[in-house]
Amino acid sequence: MFLFDIYNNILYYTKEFIVTSTSPNLFIHGLMAVFIIYLLTKRPFKPRQNDTLTKAEEDELIREWSPIPLTPKSNPLEVLNQTELIIQESEGTHVTINNKKYLNLARSNYLGLINNPEINKISENAIRKYGVGSCGPRGFYGTIDVHLDLEKKTASFMKTPEAVLYSSAYATISSAIPSFSKIGDIIIVDRGVSQPVQVGVSLSRSRIYYFNHNDMDDLQRVLEQTQFKGSKAKIVRKFVVIEGLYYNSGTIAPLPQILKFKEQYKFRLIMDESHSVGVLGSTGRGLTEHYNIDTNLVDILTGSYGNSFSSGGGFCCGSPEVVYHQRLNGVGYVFSASLPPFLACSSTKAIEMLEENPKMLEMLHSNIGELYQGLNKSGALNGLLEITSLPISPVIHLSLLDSKSNKSNRINDELLLQKIVDKAMDYGLLLTRAKYVSAEKFIPKPSIRISVSSNLSSDQIKQSIEIIKKCTSFVLESN
């Protein structure tokens, strides 16, 4: 009787809806009536009562169960990359590993300032005054006077209006890019950029286009491709991202041609100079000085204090608007503890030393030239390896010649190069393969990466060339 009354009421109100409602309301009310009828008439859900397994059946299922690995099995290269060398002591050009000294050509110490007595003394005094940490982000009690001093010094050195300081070199470029480029914007990236740049591009969630490394014809093709016209035309922000000196290849960007495109196609230029500041140019101010170009033509310029200035952290230079925007929107600036004050002091001192003693640059350029020419001369690498870097780069990549390379199996090439590295250690020379993470968009060909320092002596360079030659012949001619 109760259900009969409900149905009568539903029919009554349905009739009223039909009489009083307009067409859209009639449709909606009709759907509601059908849905109510469905809820009232559908059968209630009753879970099935499964039979309880016997002890024998449970044991059988357990025996048949095979767990899936929590992580995929490591390939031989991944296992090799997990091998660590523990450095017991670092002194000048040498490091101590397992109580044995090695000449270190694996560390980025371009101006030879690591363990410099003057910088060590400055750092020690800063620790006594400020402690070892800053106790907070820059916007929350983490700003110390030495941070502001370093920002002013960096802006002055780079000849830009202002600079902002980050506590991590990696986070500098990976925070700067997404702080400006957002969803809907366009980023055009050189395929040769290193991992931190790739991370920044990915975090931006912008539309990403790649052009072949240092290929200006391909860059122009992509720029034309992203020039929307007609009905598709709309105002979008467009960025081109490059490195001054590419860590993955030891080559430099053709900045003059890129700036011509910048004027023609109206994009903003982001350039990372982590490996060119303190290296290129007559006074070490980077790629802009190398080409005698005004730094302010680059909209956003980032760099590191670690490779040339023996410290930590990074910087971003630009107009006051560019710098101020990052103080509010740069994730690595806002949400990270600020750079330890003693590292800020050491970076400031290192820049001052470079300004006062440009001979450090002359020594670096001389050492790069001597090592490059020594390796490049006829017979030095026995026709087995080739240098893929430029003769002005402190980052020298040695790759297998195509005749010795197994292009179908990268792991074999990596293992072969690692044998050369291991053999060099037997002679007291520390080298390293160029190692990349699997998440990198474009992984360069396998290589041995050598880092040149200004404090290497001519005898050490000649010794290194002979060891590399000897180890290359021993490994590759026997394979």
UniProtKB/Swiss-Prot annotation:
Q: In which pathway does it act?
A: Lipid metabolism; sphingolipid metabolism
Query: What does the record say about its membrane topology?
Result: Single-pass membrane protein
Parts of the chain on the Cytoplasmic side: 38-479
Q: List the disulfide bonds.
A: none
Q: What Gene Ontology terms describe where this protein resides (cellular component)?
A: endoplasmic reticulum; endoplasmic reticulum membrane; serine palmitoyltransferase complex
Membrane-crossing segments per the record: 17-37
Lineage: superkingdom? Eukaryota
Q: Which UniProt keywords apply?
A: Acyltransferase, Endoplasmic reticulum, Lipid metabolism, Membrane, Pyridoxal phosphate, Sphingolipid metabolism, Transferase, Transmembrane, Transmembrane helix
Which coarse location class applies to the principal site listed for this UniProt protein? endoplasmic reticulum
Swiss-Prot/TrEMBL GO biological process terms: ceramide biosynthetic process; sphingosine biosynthetic process
- Indicate whether Transmembrane helix appears among the record's keywords: yes
The protein's location, in the record's own words, is: Endoplasmic reticulum membrane
Write down the chemical reaction(s) this protein catalyses: L-serine + hexadecanoyl-CoA + H(+) = 3-oxosphinganine + CO2 + CoA
Q: What is its EC number?
A: 2.3.1.50
Q: How does it assemble?
A: Forms a heterodimer with sptB.
Cited PANTHER family = CLASS II AMINOTRANSFERASE/8-AMINO-7-OXONONANOATE SYNTHASE (PTHR13693), SERINE PALMITOYLTRANSFERASE 1 (PTHR13693:SF2)
The function of this protein is:
Component of serine palmitoyltransferase (SPT), which catalyzes the committed step in the synthesis of sphingolipids, the condensation of serine with palmitoyl CoA to form the long chain base 3-ketosphinganine.
Write down what this protein is called. Serine palmitoyltransferase 1
Which lineage do the record's taxonomy fields give for this organism? Answer: Eukaryota, Amoebozoa, Evosea, Eumycetozoa, Dictyostelia
Give the gene that encodes this protein: sptA
